[in-house]
Amino acid sequence: MSDYIVVKCGGSMLDQLHDVFFDCIKKLQQKYKVVIVHGGGPEIDAKLKDCNINVEKKDGLRVTPKEVMDIVQMVLCGSTNKKLVMNLQKHNLRAVGCSGCDGKLLQVQPVSEEIGYVGEVRYVETALLKGLINMNYIPVIAPVGINDNEIYNINADTAAAGIAAALSAKELIFITDVDGVLHEGKLLKKTDEFEIVNLIEKGVITGGMIPKVQAALASLKMGVQKVSIVNGTKDFTEVTGECIGTTVTRGVSIA
């Protein structure tokens, strides 16, 4: 396990990031090497609507024919990425924005012809990330990747998980607008994949929290050791560098 931490910030959270979020990133930087991966779903949907293009999803993934990929690339690599980079720099954090196709950072395998230009991470060029970090920059990654010189859309959660796994990161942190998983009205601070599945089956975890914990479970399957779900509108870091929220680790199955 290394001293890298990957922070994944969904597109719906980008306009909700205030001083407290950037203060938390500064605190994390004191102990760890930080990489940020962002989404951009709401802005992509709005731009597609402006262009009279239907938003279509299949199994949670955006169906991405060529005309949609052009807009995804424009939003993720352009306005969304640069807005977050500028926000970090405004708070005196040195950041460099790049996409997964820059330097072949994220090399992908197409998911299926049916959903178009959508890929899954198969290789991460970690030397690029490490080089930026060694120059005291925070890499801010837009989740698009490359395959056979074509650009592909990547689900931001799986892009973050792929990067975290490739770096053998200490932790993957999902930034949300809730404190974490609640059980009987109390914050569930520590849990594992088996308990999460059990809580979903019992109906304890419902609604918008389900995709969040499913993303955490998928990350664990990709080799990430620890995933935390935190509230990015509050201080989510302890003095020790530990996260305040719900931390999910891999369970140990007993035969």
Curated annotation (Swiss-Prot):
Its main location: cytoplasm. It comes from the Bacteria. GO terms for molecular function: acetylglutamate kinase activity; ATP binding. Keywords: Amino-acid biosynthesis, Arginine biosynthesis, ATP-binding, Cytoplasm, Kinase, Nucleotide-binding, Transferase. The record marks K8, K212 as: Transition state stabilizer. It is found in: Cytoplasm. Substrate binds at G40, G41, R62, N153. It catalyses: N-acetyl-L-glutamate + ATP = N-acetyl-L-glutamyl 5-phosphate + ADP. Pathway: Amino-acid biosynthesis; L-arginine biosynthesis; N(2)-acetyl-L-ornithine from L-glutamate: step 2/4. GO terms for cellular component: cytoplasm. It is an enzyme of class 2 (transferase). Coiled coil: none annotated. The keyword ATP-binding applies. One of its GO terms (biological process) is arginine biosynthetic process via ornithine. Its EC number is 2.7.2.8. InterPro entries: AceGlu_kinase-like_sf, AcgluKinase_fam, ArgB, Asp/Glu/Uridylate_kinase. Catalyzes the ATP-dependent phosphorylation of N-acetyl-L-glutamate. HAMAP family: ArgB (MF_00082). NCBIfam families: argB. Belongs to the acetylglutamate kinase family. ArgB subfamily. This is Acetylglutamate kinase. It comes from Bacillus cereus (strain ATCC 10987 / NRS 248).
